[in-house]
Amino acid sequence: MKEYKILLVDDHEIIINGIMNALLPWPHFKIVEHVKNGLEVYNACCAYEPDILILDLSLPGINGLDIIPQLHQRWPAMNILVYTAYQQEYMTIKTLAAGANGYVLKSSSQQVLLAALQTVAVNKRYIDPTLNREAILAELNADTTNHQLLTLRERQVLKLIDEGYTNHGISEKLHISIKTVETHRMNMMRKLQVHKVTELLNCARRMRLIEY
């Protein structure tokens, strides 16, 4: 049976010990290292090149959600299983959209964690069975479609508009001309079929086009 190297990222000793004990009967899941904050993840990934990363979202030093896209880009073959206390479905959606392969609640049984590991190990997606999988996948697909409406640059401009930047401020921030900023603004309004900035922002929030 193929051996899978696992890097465990969690700052709670009881969680670390619990996972290690749960995997003792399954030697093909080998925990090669565990670290306790987000800042240590990169060095550990470079050193051990894990097949699976078990990641908590609440970490000292850096938010687990923030590092998922970077890890996914740097190590695309590494599967990321988020192991968290957050039960909100919107967090599941954001986590999977960021590039995680699985989402498991810490309140779930060891059998659920094992099932999740077995699933993500073969490059499939796993969602904790206590969550509404169909609703999450529907929202995830809708988010993907919505994001494709706007270009990356348009989303950057949109975020700065939401933060209160003027056209001049956006042009300086993104190193583009004011004319280009105005063009992006008009294109976004046309795509979302709105006529005012307030309508643009309200529509963008409803469609989850603005990241926080």
From Swiss-Prot:
Q: Which residues bind DNA?
A: 167-186
Q: What is the effect of changing residue 45 to A/S?
A: Strongly decreases activity and may affect its ability to dimerize
Effect in UniProt of substituting residue 179 to A: Abolishes the DNA binding activity stimulated by acidic pH
* Outcome when changing residue 183 to A: Increases activity
**Effect ascribed to mutating residue 202 to A:** Mildly decreases activity
Q: When the coding gene is removed by deletion, what phenotypic consequences does the entry describe?
A: Decreases expression of genes encoding virulence proteins. Down-regulated targets are involved in transport, secretion, and trafficking of cellular components in addition to protein and membrane modification. Increases expression of invasion protein invF following invasion of macrophages. Regulation of gene expression is abnormal in conditions of acidic pH, during phosphate starvation and in low magnesium. Decreases survival in macrophages. Decreases level of biofilm formation and abolishes expression of csgD; simultaneous knockout of hns suppresses the effect.
The UniProt record describes its induction as: Induced about 3-fold in acidic pH compared to in neutral pH.
Localization recorded for this chain is:
Cytoplasm
Q: What does the annotation give as the result of altering residue 34 to A? A: Does not affect its activation by acidic pH
Positions of the Response regulatory domain: 5-121
- What are the record's GO terms for cellular component? cytoplasm
How is the protein altered post-translationally, as described in the entry?
SsrB phosphorylated on Asp-56 activates the expression of virulence genes whereas the unphosphorylated form controls biofilm formation. Independently of SsrA, can be phosphorylated by small inorganic phosphate donors (such as acetyl phosphate or phosphoramidate). Disulfide bond formation at Cys-203 is not required for dimerization.
Swapping residue 201 to A leads to an effect described as: Strongly decreases activity
* Positions of modified residues (S-nitrosocysteine): 203
Extra information: C-terminal tagging with photoactivatable mCherry abolishes the increase in activity seen at acidic pH, N-terminal tagging leads to slightly higher activity at acidic pH.
Q: What role does this protein play? A: Member of the two-component regulatory system SsrA/SsrB (SpiR/SsrB) that is required for intracellular proliferation and systemic dissemination within the host.
- According to UniProt, the name of this protein is Response regulator SsrB
Q: Which organism is it from?
A: Salmonella typhimurium (strain LT2 / SGSC1412 / ATCC 700720)
